[in-house]
């Protein structure tokens, strides 16, 4: 989707806010079911960002694979877990939290330093005309489809069988029934 710069910027801000707030919900919510359910809107915001970047195929794959399959699988696995009572006392700050804070803060500061010290004007970005770019994207999508339905057909079928076995195993473990 080719949008003018100001419109793209206006759409970008709510999407990024949705990503940040949704990510915080995923991490900070204490109920694991709510946390798993709040992962869906985060993945949808990521796919909408791909649409703004003119990567329609990647956005569709993001919706189909992550939102449609992985998020449903996560919610399904969480629902099958035994509803164990967690202790009421949860420490607010642990050693692991402190280490994580130090690592994340140092990574953030190093990224900000790199971004600010990079000479962005020296990086030349050449783009093709929209017509040639759309033609290349169409050919790429057709090539991906051809590879997925011919060369990679067997690996995908094996992967689906492995996922099915993992799902049956997770259900068996969650129900804690003996196999007869």
From Swiss-Prot:
Location in the cell: Plastid, Chloroplast thylakoid membrane
Cellular component, GO, one term: chloroplast thylakoid membrane
Keyword Acetylation set for record: no
Parts of the chain that traverse the membrane: 10-30, 32-52, 57-77, 95-115, 153-173
Domain of life from the UniProt record: Eukaryota
Lipid bilayer topology: Multi-pass membrane protein
Keywords assigned by UniProt, alphabetized: Chloroplast, Membrane, NAD, NADP, Plastid, Plastoquinone, Quinone, Thylakoid, Translocase, Transmembrane, Transmembrane helix, Transport
InterPro entries: NAD(P)H-Q_Oxidoreduct_6, NADH_UbQ/plastoQ_OxRdtase_su6, Nuo/plastoQ_OxRdtase_6_NuoJ
Entry's EC annotation: 7.1.1.-
UniProt main location, coarse: plastid
Enzyme type, top EC level: translocase
One function term, GO molecular function aspect: NADH dehydrogenase (ubiquinone) activity
Catalytic activity: a plastoquinone + NADH + (n+1) H(+)(in) = a plastoquinol + NAD(+) + n H(+)(out); a plastoquinone + NADPH + (n+1) H(+)(in) = a plastoquinol + NADP(+) + n H(+)(out)
Pfam families from the UniProt entry: Oxidored_q3
Function noted in UniProt: NDH shuttles electrons from NAD(P)H:plastoquinone, via FMN and iron-sulfur (Fe-S) centers, to quinones in the photosynthetic chain and possibly in a chloroplast respiratory chain. The immediate electron acceptor for the enzyme in this species is believed to be plastoquinone. Couples the redox reaction to proton translocation, and thus conserves the redox energy in a proton gradient.
Subunit organization: NDH is composed of at least 16 different subunits, 5 of which are encoded in the nucleus.
NCBIfam families the UniProt entry points to: PRK06638.1-3
Family note: Belongs to the complex I subunit 6 family.
Name of the featured protein: NAD(P)H-quinone oxidoreductase subunit 6, chloroplastic
């Amino acid at each position: 989707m080719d949008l003018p710069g100001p419109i793209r910027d206006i759409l970008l801000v709510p999407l990024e806010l949705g990503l940040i707030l949704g990510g915080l919900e995923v991490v900070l919510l204490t109920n694991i079911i709510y946390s798993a359910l709040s992962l869906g809107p985060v993945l949808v915001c990521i796919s909408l960002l791909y649409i703004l970047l003119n990567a329609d195929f990647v956005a569709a794959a993001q919706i189909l694979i992550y939102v449609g399959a992985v998020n449903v699988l996560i919610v399904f696995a969480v629902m099958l877990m035994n509803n164990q009572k967690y202790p009421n006392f949860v420490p607010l700050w642990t050693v692991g939290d402190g280490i994580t804070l130090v690592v994340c803060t140092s990574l953030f500061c190093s990224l900000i330093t790199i971004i600010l010290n990079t000479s962005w004007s020296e990086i030349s970005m050449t783009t093709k005309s929209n017509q040639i770019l759309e033609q290349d994207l169409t050919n790429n999508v057709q090539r991906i489809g051809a590879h997925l339905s011919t060369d990679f057909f067997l690996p995908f079928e094996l992967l689906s069988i492995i996922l099915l076995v993992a799902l049956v195993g997770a259900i068996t473990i969650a129900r804690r029934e003996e196999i007869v």
